[in-house]
């Protein structure tokens, strides 16, 4: 088993963003970090595919702290953090998350069996 702490996840988010301008969400950053730890322990360079199936907009507080420093999100509303994240990464919040700006937690949408591809294409605006 591999464990990954919040500081490592935040560090990976910032490192990838600084190098590529890509805002990696915390869950995917955790998966990538766990893979890197496992690979280093095995002492092998095994290629992997890690799918990014989430959005940084589900984790605006974590994203703000990763990109702007620990404690940055304290006292700021989700609405403000979302606006700042949109400006920082140059990507508008997807419609699926826009109505959730005032909620503390954002549930994932439910997708019916056999409709995953269609749902992803719709969310990307290409269906």
How should each PLM-predicted stretch be described?
Residues 1-127:
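PLP-dependent amino-acid enzyme catalytic core
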